[in-house]
Swiss-Prot record:
One of its GO terms (cellular component) is cytosol. Keywords: Isomerase, Pyridoxal phosphate. GO terms for molecular function: alanine racemase activity; pyridoxal phosphate binding. SMART domains: Ala_racemase_C. Catalyzes the interconversion of L-alanine and D-alanine. May also act on other amino acids. The gene is alr. The modification N6-(pyridoxal phosphate)lysine is found at residue 34. This is Alanine racemase. It holds the Pfam family Ala_racemase_N. Belongs to the alanine racemase family. One of its GO terms (biological process) is D-alanine biosynthetic process. It is an enzyme of class 5 (isomerase). Its EC number is 5.1.1.1. Residues 226-271 form the RPE1 insert domain. It comes from Rickettsia typhi (strain ATCC VR-144 / Wilmington).
Amino acid sequence: MSLCTLEINLSAIKNNYRLLQDICTTALVGAAVKANGYGIGAMQIAKALIEENCQYFFVATSEEGINLRKALNNDITILVLNGVFTHDALELIQYNLTPVLNNLKQIEIWQKFSNLKEKILPCYLHFNTGLNRFGLNYDEIEQLINDRDLLKGLDLQYIISHLAASEEMDNPYNLAQLNRFKDYLEYFPNVKASLANSGGIFLGQDYHFDLARPGAALYGLNSLIEVSYNLSYKEKFERNTPALATTVCINKCADVNTRLTYKVPLKGSYRLQNPVTLKAPIIHLQNLTLDSHIGYNMTFTTKRDSIIATLPLGYADGFSRNFSNQGEVFINSRSVPIVGRVSMDLINIDVTDLPPSEVFLGQEVEIIGNYCTPDKIASIIGTVGYEVLTSLGSRYKRKYIS
């Protein structure tokens, strides 16, 4: 077993969920637990959130859904975002999983199995409003509008879409997608809707509809970035959203020459909590003289006599090689630099400036925590906090704190 410990504070995740519930005053709040709960434990997270009355859980694949269903009661709704395929349709039915249908072919498959089983099957529909990754396109939606028999035998419970730039609060693409979504929903007046991911929740109540489905915010990740738009709405809209630049959409977005501003509900009064702490012990210490080389390819050379500590984790554990000679870890709240190349199983840190009483074999080093959050780590290596969490390896000893 690994010497490193990954602690997941379930109370922090529950706190984040309650915060999001407080913002979504007119909508239910589900939870995205795909990719094993963003790498930190889908089953444990789901069980904790059920205690907060969360009833909707989103996974990516049928396999993820089956694993989650085995841990949860049958009355909890589990949504499979990738939809249904011929090879897994029977398993979705067996394990009471609801597919999010992304194209007419998936609708056809689900309807076929509805006929085969002689039962009405639940489903969500995903409408593409501009992310252009998944979802029924305009032509397919038009077919559904004109031929409702395409949904015969199916219990359409929700229509969803996904925002492409929700973390950019002033991005006009958000409003364009919102209006496109509303246009589509007019043809399905009795069907509930879901649009807001984590960033969408903070865009305001217009984006909440009936169900929000946060992921990042549950795990303490920042779902908002600051972007300044100096172009007028129309200029920005026409330049960056050609797929949606229709007269209908532009006219429905109010004054096209007005810069958009969004207000975060109660901005500043809410703080998401980081639920993840990764700790590793010092397993080796060595004294090196001036001009000693450290690690593969000698990419770091000491500029003084130095004390170098080795920690038992590396890129096989999701600690990116991009941290080589950059980034920091913490010992008793003191910053310690990473030196040399990150290798598969080991990293080196320079502890020369620490008090001698804090440098010893077995000393606990914080890799991820309140001093170095996933978002901060991500900013160092040019990625996002989501990737930091989902990359965490399987070798860590995991400890769940209630």
